[in-house]
Amino acid sequence: MEFSVQSSTIEQLQTECLIVGVYQDHQLSSAAVQLDQVSGGYLTRLLQMGDLDGSVGQSLLLHNVPNIKSARVLLVGCGKQDELTESQYKKIMQQMMHAINATAVQQAVCFLTELMVKQRTIYWNIRFAIESIQASRYVYDVFKSIKAKVVGKLTQIIFNVANQQDLLEAERGLKHAQAIASGMIYAKNMANCPPNICNPAYLAELAQGLATDYQQIQTRIVDEAEMATLGMNAYLAVSQGSHNPAFLSVIEYNHHPDPSAKPIVLVGKGLTFDAGGISLKPSDAMDEMKYDMGGAAAVYGTMKALAEMQLPLNVVGILAGCENMPDGNAYRPGDILTTMNGLTVEVLNTDAEGRLVLCDALTYVERFDPACVIDIATLTGACMVALGTHNSGLMSTHNELADELFTAASQANDKVWRLPLGEEYQEQLKSNFADLANIGGRFGGAITAGQFLSNFTQKYRWAHLDIAGTAWQSGVAKGATGRPVPLLAQFLINRAQQE
């Protein structure tokens, strides 16, 4: 799909379809008002007939509107004028695509980005429009013999802005939106790939591909032999039950004006399949454990978006690839592991493996002297119980960093909710035989997992995102969501603006 922005008036435009918004109570958007005036009150008379009441999700296709050069006009319901939310706006964009795809239209000019969405600027309206449109078009049919049919003939959408002053912000929104939408697609494709294909070596291969595609990126791969030399014994213990060796992929993006500037580090949990190990998971929905590398997929997609946006930052992305399987060589409940930073961990449950992989990865990244570290992980079902599937869990030992992430999440409409950490939760991680236990009991599971990780992040500013409830959807619409790429990309955009 080709996207562009322009600033023109309704009467000047000659395209296959104009797209304008109509609110409830017969209220017209500003573009619809212009169209109504040019057409001699055609829209006013039409609305009085009651064929469209302006509810979110409605649409009405018109042909040969008087005094309008365009062949078609699509009216899209936008709800109540002063109450339009980001979620409703995205639904409006999806309905627009559904209606257009039912026609032979190849090019359309869209005025819906003029809508007032919680006082968002044109930048955000363009961002959300493109992200929504690309999400609505996404299909993963790589392994289907019969590919999904291309729905509709639309190949170009031109977003019209109110004036020339808005064009610069609109173009910036366009650039960022296309990069972020592309990153989300990369993340979805990685996460949706089946685990017999997408193993730790596959993650490493894709990571190396970014270095081929972008001159600002260099990638190196840490294999199991190097991990053993480094003392990454917790990471290796998780991997030892699998025939697929672990690989830690290090993606370095260097584009800061000061080459010595401290990097932002993103660490993604990359369990390409998590059977639970000896503490075997129930078979019901175990297929979805291919999504246990959603954190790595998000980091991969974010690095793609970052390279497309060419932000003036230094960023390191870590894909902590591993597989957790039951086997005669698998690690056991009762094992005591010596982590890379020297702390010992008693394994009480082999299905609490993500934190064991991450604790060594979080120690590994100390070598970068990072400005901050954010780990992203489908870490706990407990986070889903606490927050559902709408908000990712946010935990941090640094309030300023947590506030930055919360702000970026709100801006990007990629929501998070902060959960506490503290010494009270550390008590739950006590072991009779080691420095730490790898689980903290029945209560507060998402928090105790974050608390466990905090023991390995003492040398830098750190935050943890638990995306177990947001990285993928189950049911009829099963598939990866691409989250939290928008949040992470926005965090990096904000950091770049501070430089």
Swiss-Prot record:
Its EC number is 3.4.11.1, 3.4.11.10. Binds 2 manganese ions per subunit. Disulfide bonds: none annotated. Keywords: Aminopeptidase, Cytoplasm, Hydrolase, Manganese, Metal-binding, Protease. Its main location: cytoplasm. Its cofactor is Mn(2+). It is an enzyme of class 3 (hydrolase). Mn(2+) 2 binds at residues 269, 274, 292, 353. Pfam families: Peptidase_M17 (PF00883), Peptidase_M17_N (PF02789). GO terms for cellular component: cytoplasm. The active site is at 281, 355. GO terms for molecular function: manganese ion binding; metalloaminopeptidase activity. It is found in: Cytoplasm. GO terms for biological process: proteolysis. It catalyses: Release of an N-terminal amino acid, Xaa-|-Yaa-, in which Xaa is preferably Leu, but may be other amino acids including Pro although not Arg or Lys, and Yaa may be Pro. Amino acid amides and methyl esters are also readily hydrolyzed, but rates on arylamides are exceedingly low; Release of an N-terminal amino acid, preferentially leucine, but not glutamic or aspartic acids. Mn(2+) 1 binds at residues 274, 351, 353. Belongs to the peptidase M17 family. Presumably involved in the processing and regular turnover of intracellular proteins. Catalyzes the removal of unsubstituted N-terminal amino acids from various peptides. This is Probable cytosol aminopeptidase. The gene is pepA.
